[in-house]
């Protein structure tokens, strides 16, 4: 169980022989109690500032690209981006196609579609149908992938249609049968859009079937890693072309850079379609503890690390440098243990001479 703000505060107060707080008196703390509460958060700040890329602050996000736009803001909780993690891929057009926790964004076409928590979450169709409208580009070809399972071991197939209206068959009309009842079956096919709005329609007639996921994206967009370049390199080599007022310079993005103020990232060349998505990893800023029941993000075994840092600041407040030095020594020792657990990486030398995505292990681990 994660350690609460109240527990951390009382751990420090107890070692200082001060009056402890309760859940009812926590918000009305006074004097040294309030100072210790502040020092708890200050100590947590120190830990995260010392470790930087701590996995507990790791996050992954995506950014949909817009034709002609080359700079995009980082999330509000952004701290630091892994610039080697930027990947360009086709935009996923289906909303909530994984059915992770519900079937919102899907409209009932017939019967009573429902959500089931089986697997990672599924759309349950028991003599029912559901559909969703998606944005498409006329005359462009799209990949569609649907995984279907039969909980009652029925071989009756799932009807899958794509058209210009709900249930329309202008672009696709097929059936995916299930014979392997444990693994289910996966439909992999394509369709060419004939309208700006297309409808994906799923129907299980007179049978119960579960849909694990529905995925649709452009077939002519390949997933590729974006090459990181410095902002200076972008200014010298790419910006003049990218800023030319000519849409013929728009193309498939190849490079990514970060702005000097670290508020946004840029891609080059400017995208030539709205159907690109960029995914990347970043590290978040942490949120200060506030209420007595707030939990620290670090594992419980590092509780004393925060306590030692708060004690250090408290002793400094009391003009007690000797005890402050002892508390700091304990903090530094435990901080090294945390870095061993979370901040140590197996780094290897790489050569990017042959290709952007080829990493060559030249000399083993770099110590």
Question: Can you say where each PLM-predicted feature lies in the sequence?
Answer:
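Short carbohydrate-recognition loop motifs
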Residues: 111-129
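Extracellular beta-strand ligand-recognition surfaces/modules
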Residues: 158, 186-215
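Surface-exposed coil/turn segments at beta-strand junctions on protein surfaces, enriched
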Residues: 125, 137-139, 180-182, 193-195, ...
């Amino acid at each position: 169980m994660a350690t609460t703000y109240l527990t951390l505060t009382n751990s420090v107060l107890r070692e200082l022989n001060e009056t402890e707080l309760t859940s009812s008196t926590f918000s009305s703390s006074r004097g040294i109690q309030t100072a210790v509460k502040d020092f708890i958060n200050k100590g947590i700040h120190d830990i995260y500032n010392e470790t930087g890329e701590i996995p507990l602050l790791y996050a992954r996000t995506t950014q949909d690209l817009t034709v002609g736009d080359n700079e995009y803001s980082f999330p509000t909780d952004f701290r630091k981006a892994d610039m080697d993690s930027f990947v360009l891929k086709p935009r996923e057009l289906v909303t909530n196609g994984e059915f992770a926790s519900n079937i919102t964004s899907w409209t009932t076409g017939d019967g009573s579609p429902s959500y089931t928590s089986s697997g990672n979450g599924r759309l349950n169709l028991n003599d029912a149908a559901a559909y969703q409208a998606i944005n498409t580009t006329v005359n462009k070809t799209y990949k569609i992938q649907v995984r279907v399972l039969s909980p009652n071991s029925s071989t009756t197939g799932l009807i899958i249609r794509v058209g210009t209206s709900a249930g329309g068959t202008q672009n696709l009309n097929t059936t995916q049968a299930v014979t392997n009842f444990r693994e289910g079956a996966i439909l992999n096919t394509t369709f060419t859009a004939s309208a700006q709005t297309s409808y994906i329609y799923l129907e299980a007639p007179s049978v119960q079937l579960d849909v694990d996921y529905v995925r649709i994206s452009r077939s002519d967009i390949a997933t590729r890693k974006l090459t990181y370049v410095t902002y200076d390199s972008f200014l010298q080599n790419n910006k003049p072309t990218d800023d030319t007022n000519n849409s013929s310079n728009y193309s498939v993005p190849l490079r990514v850079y970060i702005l000097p103020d670290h508020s946004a990232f840029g891609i080059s060349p400017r995208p030539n379609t709205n159907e690109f998505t960029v995914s990347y990893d970043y590290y978040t800023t942490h949120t200060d503890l506030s209420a007595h029941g707030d939990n620290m993000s670090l594992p419980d075994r590092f509780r004393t690390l925060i306590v030692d840092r708060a004690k250090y600041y408290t002793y400094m407040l009391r003009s007690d440098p000797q005890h402050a030095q002892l508390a700091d020594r304990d903090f530094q020792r435990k901080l090294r243990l945390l870095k061993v657990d979370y901040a140590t990486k197996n780094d290897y030398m790489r050569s990017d001479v042959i290709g952007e995505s080829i990493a060559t292990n030249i000399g083993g681990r770099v110590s």
